[in-house]
């Protein structure tokens, strides 16, 4: 599981966090999973680095298989989120990142997270995530499944607006497309 005592010096711990573990209804947030991760890391004298995700290939269903991290309420009408299956990396289903309800859920969660956690000393930094496989902002080799640029921009702007103190980290290849 990657959790344990290590003799190698370290001060940070990393975790993925499913969006559906945070967003439990429209505008309704549950912070217990993130609070637990933060408390555990702080209890070991460390800070947490984390990334939210929606699509984690070959992951997370009880007993194995795939389970989406799209919040459950977005799977029902009106305008339910639809999915495109893929077989790479063990398989999964990319959500329709252009679905406005999904975009609103992502940006709302980021804003709420910023209101609650910006400046929290238990957080080393937050990885910009949510979009693409593992929240890594790519769907290679299925590039057509990646979020439209309007969704990418909405997520960027949400992180930028929500976090003034806590550092938000992006990979250089994510930045390349915006320069």
Roles of regions detected by a PLM:
Residues 13, 41, 113, 126, ...:
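Conserved, mostly hydrophobic/aromatic
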Residues 35-43, 118, 159-163:
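Short, surface-exposed basic-aromatic patches at helix termini and helix-loop junctions that form
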């Amino acid at each position: 599981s990657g959790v344990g005592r290590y003799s190698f010096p370290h001060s940070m711990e990393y975790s993925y966090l499913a969006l559906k573990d945070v967003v439990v209804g429209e505008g309704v947030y549950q912070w217990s999973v993130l609070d637990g991760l933060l408390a555990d890391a702080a209890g070991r004298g460390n800070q947490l680095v984390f990334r939210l995700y929606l699509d984690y290939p070959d992951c997370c269903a009880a007993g194995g298989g795939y389970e989406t991290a799209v919040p459950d309420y977005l799977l029902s009408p009106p305008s339910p989120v639809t999915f495109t299956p893929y077989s790479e990396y063990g398989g999964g289903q990319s959500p329709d990142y252009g679905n406005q309800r999904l975009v609103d859920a992502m940006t709302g969660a980021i804003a709420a997270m910023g209101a609650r956690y910006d400046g929290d000393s238990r957080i080393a930094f937050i990885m910009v995530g949510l979009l693409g496989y593992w929240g890594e902002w790519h769907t290679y080799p299925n590039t057509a499944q990646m979020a439209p640029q309007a969704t990418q921009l909405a997520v960027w702007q949400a992180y930028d607006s929500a976090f003034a103190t806590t550092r938000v980290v992006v990979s250089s290849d994510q930045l390349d497309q915006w320069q």
